[in-house]
Swiss-Prot record:
Induction: Expressed in the late phase of the viral replicative cycle. Belongs to the orthopoxvirus OPG091 family. Pfam families: Peptidase_C92. Contributes to vaccinia virus virulence in mice but not to replication in cell culture. This is Protein OPG091.
Length: 165
């Protein structure tokens, strides 16, 4: 199953979606294993939406299909507490329009996710890089609170059994 259909069918609001692209301006400078992340907002007026922060546009909301344009690989993670995930998804909307960057009043994709989940009561550890606390994909994927429910490079569907309960 492709990631878009998987998310539309199984992923709860607030799931975090990691993707790697064929072409990225920042991928060579990015020490993160997964190069980009967004928060699955859910549906609004029958449109599946993702909140992300990009180099050119800052924090924005995009259709799920657009989020995946040009992707190479994808992974989807969730928490056991769906209510916390909903709070994080709702928080992501309050950050729309913040410019991209690493300063105090700026937001890059991994910080977006960390800040949304911090507001929902989930603190994420950071890495100290060049004197700054930076969030990377590893800060989420290495945290055992996060459950991987989809990996486009390993399409075993034990994950679906977990989601069905």
């Amino acid at each position: 199953m492709d990631p878009v259909n998987f998310i539309k069918t199984y992923a709860p609001r607030g799931s975090i979606i990691f993707i790697n692209y064929t072409m990225s301006l920042t991928s060579h400078l990015n020490p993160s294993i997964e190069k980009h992340v967004g928060i699955y907002y859910g549906t609004l007026l029958s449109e599946h939406l993702v909140v992300e922060s990009t180099y050119r546009k800052g924090v924005r909301i995009v259709p799920l299909d657009s989020f995946f344009e040009g992707y190479l690989s994808a992974k989807v993670y969730m928490l056991e507490n769906i209510q916390v995930m909903k709070i994080a998804a709702d928080t992501s909307l309050t950050l729309l329009g913040i410019p991209y960057g690493f300063g105090h009043d700026r937001m890059y994709c991994f910080k977006l996710v960390a800040d949304c989940y911090k507001n929902a009561g989930i603190d994420t550890s950071s890495k100290r890089i060049l004197g700054k606390d930076i969030f990377l994909s590893q800060n989420f994927t290495d945290d055992n609170r996060w459950i991987k429910i989809y990996d486009s490079n390993n399409l075993t569907f034990w994950q679906i059994d977990y989601l069905k309960g």
